[in-house]
């Protein structure tokens, strides 16, 4: 089976481990995008600590789960989003206002939609977490 998206596989593994009540999950392979996505999730308290393990191949990440995550997912293809259109995307993807985050990749890095609005940057939509 071919991997279409490493990020989608990682978030799927986190979702499945969270649903089964696991305390930690191993993600491999890893990438810089996955690490930045996890940093945003960690900043908002959806996951605990995570550790990158360099095995001289593609690397592994061990993520500690807190039980606070309901769902996370990838938006594919990565649509271009203007600053004014971010609100429409959050309304479509998230279950309620002020609940969850849409994660964007911008010229200023990977961040959630609120931080992108504060910095007044737009970019491509990566995924969501709530």
Swiss-Prot record:
Does the record bear Nucleotidyltransferase in its keywords? no
Which Gene3D superfamilies does this UniProt record tie to the protein?
A: 3.30.1370.30, 3.30.1490.10
Q: What's a BP term from Gene Ontology annotated to this protein? A: translation
Protein's UniProt keywords contain Ribosomal protein: yes
GO CC term, one of those recorded: cytosolic small ribosomal subunit
GO function terms (MF aspect): structural constituent of ribosome
- InterPro entries in the record, alphabetically? Ribosomal_uS8, Ribosomal_uS8_CS, Ribosomal_uS8_sf
What NCBIfam families does the annotation carry? PRK04034.1
HAMAP family from the xrefs? Ribosomal_uS8_A
Q: Which family does it belong to?
A: Belongs to the universal ribosomal protein uS8 family.
Q: What is this protein called?
A: Small ribosomal subunit protein uS8
Origin organism lineage: Eukaryota, Fungi, Dikarya, Ascomycota, Saccharomycotina
> What gene codes for this chain?
RPS22A
């Amino acid at each position: 089976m071919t991997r279409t998206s490493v990020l989608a596989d990682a978030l799927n593994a986190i979702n499945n481990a969270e649903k089964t009540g696991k305390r930690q999950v191993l993600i491999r392979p890893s990438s810089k995008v996955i690490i930045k996505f996890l940093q945003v999730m960690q900043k908002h308290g959806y996951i605990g600590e995570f550790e990158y393990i360099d095995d001289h191949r593609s690397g592994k990440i061990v993520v500690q789960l807190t039980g606070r995550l309901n769902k996370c997912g990838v938006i594919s293809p990565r649509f271009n989003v203007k600053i004014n259109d971010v609100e429409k995307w959050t309304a479509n993807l998230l279950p309620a206002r002020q609940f969850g985050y849409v994660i964007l990749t911008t010229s200023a890095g990977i961040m959630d939609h609120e931080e992108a609005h504060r910095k007044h940057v737009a970019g491509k939509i990566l995924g969501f977490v709530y």
